[in-house]
């Protein structure tokens, strides 16, 4: 199975700061998908097919990458962006998730 490694595991950012987190796949995948999860809630699809913004996801979010290297970027951190972000692939069975990047707000 394809192992997804997210980096960093935990990070903090101030309001307005640019944020980038990465997801590395153990083998090449066609697309990467990203989910946002806030404490006590179910994960929400945030970015799909590497770079397409899901419904409800703000335009300050973007995704990029190919093969084994993918990233999620927030151009300007907002308080509501504090959450855990998971990458996911289904190019190869079984579907797998990364362990997540926890993004905290630095005040």
UniProtKB/Swiss-Prot annotation:
Framework-4: where is this region? Answer: 97-106
**Which GO cellular component terms are attached?**
immunoglobulin complex
Instruction: Extract the ranges annotated as region (Complementarity-determining-2).
Output: 49-55
Top-rank taxon of the source lineage equals: Eukaryota
Q: Kindly state a single biological-process term from the GO annotations of this entry.
A: immune response
Renumbered to this chain, region (Framework-3) spans 56-87
Keyword check for Mitochondrion: no
Annotated region (Framework-2), positions in chain: 34-48
InterPro entries attached here? Ig-like_dom, Ig-like_dom_sf, Ig-like_fold, Ig_sub, Ig_V-set, IgV_Light_Chain
Keywords recorded for this protein, A-Z: Adaptive immunity, Disulfide bond, Hybridoma, Immunity, Immunoglobulin
Q: What protein does this entry describe?
A: Ig kappa chain V-VI region NQ6-8.3.1
Q: Whose protein is this, by species?
A: Mus musculus
Q: Please spell out the taxonomic lineage of the organism that makes this protein.
A: Eukaryota, Metazoa, Chordata, Craniata, Vertebrata
